[in-house]
Every structure is written in structure tokens, then in C-alpha cells.
Curated annotation (Swiss-Prot):
Residues 333-383, 409-486, 592-644 form a coiled coil. The lineage of its organism: Eukaryota, Metazoa, Cnidaria, Anthozoa, Hexacorallia. Residues 316-341 are annotated as: Disordered. One of its GO terms (biological process) is positive regulation of ubiquitin-dependent protein catabolic process. Keywords: Coiled coil. It comes from the Eukaryota. This is Coiled-coil domain-containing protein 22 homolog. GO terms for molecular function: cullin family protein binding. The keyword Transmembrane helix does not apply.
Amino acid sequence: MEEVDNIIIHTLRQIGCEIPEEIQSLREFTTTVIVQASSKCLHVINEDIDIPSNLPSSMSAKFRVGTMLAAALQDLGYRGEIGYQTFLYSNEKDIRSVFMFLVEHLPKETSLAASEPLGSSVLLNRRVASDLAQRLTLSWTPTFLKKGGVRWKGSKPKTYFREGSASMRRFHACNLKSPQGLTDLTAKISKETKAYYSVIPYVTSQPPCRQDVVPSVLESNSLSVTAVAEWELEWNQSGLSSRLTKEEYLARKRQRLEKKIKDHVLAEMQRVEAGGRAASDLSDIVSSFSDRVSTIESQTQGSRFTRTEKLQFAQDEQKAAAMAGLSESGPPKMDTEEELQKKREQELEALQNKLKDLASSVDEKKSEIKTMNAGLQQTNEQVTATKVQNSEHEESYKVKKRTVDLLPDAENNIAKLQGVVDSSSQRLVNLAQQWETHRTALIDEYRELKVINANKVSETQKKLEEIKSLREKMKEVAEETRGKDDLYKQLVSEYERMSRDVNRSAYTRRILEIVGNIKKQKEEINKILVDTKSVQKEINQLSGKLDRTFTVTDELIFRDAKKDEACRKAYKYLASLHENCKELIQAVEDTGVIMREIRDLEEQIDTESQRNTANNLERITADHKQMKEENATLTKKIKALKSS
């Protein structure tokens, strides 16, 4: 933190803060220096903010100044805990975060506003702007002098670069085929698959154009990465909670998809059949209408063909006469717009009446069809009910017929039936006794299996909760790493945009050291994540192996426990050993939790020790005494004014 403190102190001195030369870190800042520097930074950021830079002697005025500073920082977007105590009774950590926030928001002459978020889009826009500015400073060169758009850049840094878009190609990707599932060396590959993989052309030969190789590879890689990310997200959200293996989860998902496809196909087939029925109904209506027209035509002389031919020729002659403006009566007669409009309205009304008649007839037919369907359904129900009654009557008839057949030799038949009933009752008693003997053993086994299942469910739930917590920690670490990467990019971009006329090698070296520390922390975090994953995987494997071993051993010993006393004792020892192992594992987990809590408490103790609580308490006590004295003087003045 010394480098950060030096950068903050140097920046505060540059904007005009009076900081003594002997102060080398934020730990040495007094309340007066903190208030002065904060007020100066706020005024530089926003000139409308005017807060006193010197603390007054009155305690109420001091509290007012501290509250104004805290409110101004909150208006700027500071999200940490802040109040008047941050400035009057400060600690190193809070003051460092406050000054880092203020320094980031200070305006810079050589860059954009520091409060601008530097995301990937902003960095891209800045890079495009710098590249365009660089291109505008260069002289124009004809295209035929630049082979592939490459030209020499004489200024620093001296290098070749590509100019223009003549040599660029469109991003066109093709579907690539490559061997799958070869990463697992233990898996067996069939001969057919090997033969297929042997004849697959190389990836560089699959696209039709050579320029499409790189886009195709990039597209294939992005698709595979996206598929893996989507599968991990789906497995974390739905797969773990389902308590199924990956193969079972995929099989169930495949069944759901097949069912959806089947339902969709059936719905489409029903829709097409319904459309066909509607089309057939419409064709029936049209045919009936044409039959009516044919009956009307049949009443006139001539065949239908000659009649339609005459009508066509008559219509053509009438149209020609209307176009020529001639009529049989004599001079041409032109229809007015009103007459034409009336004719159109009459024709439209006639067509609407015909349409209404057709619609009413269609509705009547539909209602008749509905009534017929209802009657048909009712008839079918009556038929089924009649069939059921007939079957019942047939059964009763068979029973009565057998009874009548037995009546001639009633005494012998009754004795035989009594013997059958007695044997059946005796067999039922024997079966009940056998069931009781097996029932107790089955109930005991059921209870044991129920207890084992409950233990497994609780252990599985614990493992799932641990996995979820680990995944949340991994996400937090990944977000923290991403934030540090963004900070690294921001620092690098700011360093590249800084003017080179000022000698800032020391601060650049410190920034690079900070970046190196960030990289080391990132590597350590990645190493910890890898170790955590491996340990979790090993724990899962060992727990699964332990459960399977215990289950097999339990079955083998329990099979012989009823016959052998030694096996019974061994079974008891096995159960006690299993319970003791569970208690031991629980004790180890509790010990780990306690150790983690101890580390957290130690960290809290360290943070509390850095807050200078004792010094702040002394200062608060002194301020409290000063407030009492001020209150006493004020009460004396009030009494003197009242007495006068």
C-alpha cells in the first residue's frame, strides 16, 4: 500500500493541497489534512461544491463540515459506509478508499473523464479513435503501391501495418467435421468409427475457399465453448437439484424432447385433417349451389353448354356496346356516377344476402351435425350399457345353471363343497402364518433400508450445499479476477495515453509492480480453484467408494448373520464402525468450520486493530469534554441574558 499512498499524496500535492513533506503515508494524515484534501478534491471535481477546507473550533461546526463532506461524496456515487466520523475519527482503510475514489474522479487534461466506465466497448472505441487519428497523420499512398494493403510506418514505433480494406475478406464460416470423443483414452472406439475418421478430410481442406478456414475454425470453437457453458449452467441449475446422474438426466431430457416433438406432429396432423374437412364442407356447399343453378338452367331451352355459351357471348356483346356507347333504342346513353353507384350497391346487397343465406344454411347443417353426433354418442353409450347388462345376465345364468345341475345329488355335492371350503380356510391360515414369519423380517429390513436411505439423502443434501457454496465462491473469485483484469486494462490504457514529456518512471514502475502482484494473486487464485476442484472430486470419489463398500459388506455379512453368531457380531461391529466413522468425519468437518471461523475472527481482530480505536476513543472523549465546556459557557450566557 505504500505505492498507492505515494501516488495519492503526489496527486493531492499537484492539485494544491498543503501536505507537509514529512508525511509519507495516509496513516500520518491528521484530521485537518484529511478535511482540507477532501474539500480541495471535491472543489476540483465540481466547482459548485464549496465546503470549508479549515475546521472551525466549535464542535457543532466540525460535525456540520464532516456531514457536508460525506453528503458530497455520496452524491458523487461513493458506495462505501461514510459519515462525519470518517473524517473526524478516521482510520487508514476508510481514508484510503475515500481518497482513491476522489483521485479516480479528478479531471485529467490528457484523457477523458476518469469516471467513465472502461469496459470492452469503451476500450474498442478508444482504440479505433487512436487508429483513425494515426491514419489521418499519414500521407495518402496509391493502392497499387501497397501489396496486400501493407505499408511502412516511419514514425515511432517503426513497423509495418495494414491499411485499407482491399485485402480483407468477409467472415464466412462452414460446418466442420472432426473426430469426437478421442480425449478419453480408456474408451473403446469401434472399427466403423475409426474407418469413418480415417477418411475425413483435414479441417483445412473442408471449406470450399481457403479464406474460410480461419472463420470456420473460430465458429466451431465458439460453438463448442458455448455448448459447454450452457451445459454447465443447465447442470448447475437443474441437474444437481434433480439428484440424477448426467446420463440419466440426458436420457430424461431426450425423452421429454421426443414427447414434445410427437405432440407437435400429432397437433399438426389434426390441424391438417381439420383443414381438409373444412375444405370438403366448402366444396359441398359450392357443389350444392351449382346444382341449384343447373336446375334453373335446365328449365330453359338448350343444353347447359349452349346456354353458358350464349350467356358469355351476350355479356361480351353488352360490354362492347357499353364501351362504344351504343344501344338498340338509338343514340348512345351514358350512365351517371350516381346510377353506377346505385347499381354497385344493389349488386353488393344481393351478394351479401346470398352470403347470409349460405352462412345460415351452413349453421343449420352444423347444428344438425352436432345433434346427430350427440345422438350417435348417446346410442353408443346405450349399446355399451346393454352389452354390460347382457354379460352380467350371462354370468348369473351360468351360475344358476351350475346350481341346478348340482341339485339331483345335493348331499354329496354339499359335502364336497364343505370339504373344499375347509381346505381353503386351512390354506388361508397356513398362508397367514407364513406371511407373519416373513413379515417381521421384511419390516426390519424395510426400516433399516429407510434409515440408510435417509442418511444417504441427508449426506447428498450436504454435499449439494457444499458444491453450491463452492460454486458461488468460484463465481465470486472469477468476478474479482475479472474486475482486476479490467483494472489492469484501465491502467495500461491510461499509461499508453499519458504524455511522455513528464518523467513518471517511478510511478510507472509502481503500477507495473501492482499489476505483477495482481497477476500473482490471479495465479494463486486459479491454483486454489484447481486444488479445490481436485479435492472435491477426490472427496466425491472416496465417499462413493465408501458407500459402495459398506453396502456390499453389509449385504455379505447380513446374509450369514442369521446362521452364524460370529457373523452377527461382525455385523454389529461393522454398524458401530460405520457410525464412528461418520462421527469422525463430522468432527473433522466441524474442526474445519471452527478453524475457518478462527481465521475470520483473527482477520476481524487485525482490521479492528488497524482502526486506531484507542486513539479515536481518546479524541472522542476530548471532543465530548469540549462540547460540555461549550454547553456550559452557552448556559452561562443564556442565564446572564435572562438576568439582565
